[in-house]
Design a protein with these regions (language model features):
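Conserved glycine-rich cofactor-binding loop
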Residues: 14, 19-22
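Conserved glycine-rich Rossmann-like NAD(P)H-binding loop of the short-chain dehydrogenase/reductase
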Residues: 35-51
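The beta1-alpha1 cofactor-binding region of Rossmann-like NAD(H)/NADP(H)-dependent oxidoreductases
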Residues: 46, 68-79, 111
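Substrate-binding pocket helix/loop in short-chain dehydrogenase/reductase
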Residues: 105-106, 110-115
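Active-site helix of classical SDR
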Residues: 129, 166-169
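Residue(s) in the substrate-gating loop at a strand-loop-helix junction
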Residues: 150
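SDR active-site lid
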Residues: 183-255, 259-282
Length: 338
């Protein structure tokens, strides 16, 4: 019996992805390119963009455009969107994915951590969405705007408070834009992923007892039971865009946490407090951080584990380290193509 390939509603459209040079954004660019989309990949780092574009082109055979842009800069974002709109003959899909993540107890950070998270995660999303809406309204097929939030925006996660606050704002923005663009040729989809194996632990910023914060986060983010394969996550997101869904919460753990928080928020807050007691205590002094995950003292993703503790922790972090190599997160060198 002959088999047929299901045509996607996204096939051949024009797309722009911010934070597209690595991790989830890189995979979204690749899957859009595989669908025959004209893709612009945007990020702050020119070298990362070059490597990311080469990775996508090697895997898909498609050519992607790149734009260096800091999403915190409103004028630069406007120019980026205008350039993609002109170059690609319009815009049909825009995915606001750029962001930063800080991991530290609140006692080890100050207001600047919140300002940084809000300016990049929320401010960058606002800049992208507001610049993208006019060309999306003009789309012949109806524009699709996707905002990447987080389960951390649906409930506060211990040691990720600035990130949670910023992602909560992204979630509210998505709901508001969905309501105000209803019936106006644009659909807005907000995605709230749980933990994903993207290798992002190497790009996150760690404070307090940085090496211990890095250890728990990298292991948990790579654990198969609670984290999601990044390729699968990217495909789920694009399917949600195809169907013009309002909201998507990824991973069973994230969905369970979100539902429980909606029904019994006080109980979830108490459980979060218990979880916080299991995490590293703030240092007495200034601590080790802040430092990017790839620069945390003692971390070497190619170093074998020797102690039992290292082996147990490595069960999760090894998968995340593998994802880091694959998805352009590994700081010392280029990604693999596997």
């Amino acid at each position: 019996m002959a088999t047929t390939t299901r045509r996607s509603d996204l096939d051949g459209l024009s797309a722009l992805v911010t934070g597209g040079s690595r991790g989830l954004g890189l995979l979204l660019c690749a899957r859009l390119a595989r669908r025959g989309c004209r893709v612009t990949m945007a990020a702050r780092d020119a070298d990362e963009l070059r490597r990311g574009a080469a990775w996508v082109e090697e895997r898909t055979g498609a050519t992607v455009s790149t734009t260096v842009c800091d999403v915190r800069d409103r004028a630069a974002v406007g120019a980026m969107v205008e350039q993609a709109d002109n170059r690609q003959g319009g815009l049909d899909v825009v995915i606001a994915n750029a962001g930063v993540i800080q991991i530290a107890p609140v006692a080890s950070i100050d207001s600047r951590a919140f300002e940084d998270a809000m300016s990049t995660v929320f401010g960058g999303t606002v800049n992208t969405a507001m610049a993208a809406l006019p060309p999306l309204h003009r789309s012949d097929v109806g524009g699709r705007l996707c905002l990447i939030g987080s389960v951390g925006g649906l409930l506060a996660v211990p040691h990720l408070l600035p990130y949670s606050c910023a992602k909560a704002a992204v979630g509210t923005l998505g709901e508001g834009l969905r309501a105000e663009t209803a019936g106006k040729n644009v659909s807005v989809t907000t995605v709230h992923p749980g933990l994903m194996r993207t290798g992002s632990h190497l790009q996150a910023e760690f404070g307090g007892r940085a090496s211990k914060e890095f250890a728990w986060f990298s292991a948990l983010a790579g654990a198969p039971v609670v984290s999601m394969d990044a390729e699968r996550a990217a495909e789920r997101i694009l399917r949600a865009l195809e169907r013009r869904r309002t909201r998507l919460v990824l991973t069973p753990a994230a969905r369970a946490a979100s539902v429980t928080h909606g029904v019994a928020p006080a109980t979830v807050t108490r459980l979060s407090g218990l979880a916080a007691r299991l995490l590293p205590n703030p240092p007495d002094g200034n601590g080790e951080g802040p430092a990017e995950g790839g620069m945390v003292q003692g971390h070497d993703i190619d170093r074998p584990a020797h102690t039992v503790t290292e082996k147990v922790r490595g069960w999760g972090s090894a998968l995340n380290d593998r994802a880091a190599r694959r998805y352009n997160q590994h700081l010392p060198g280029p990604p693999t193509s596997g």
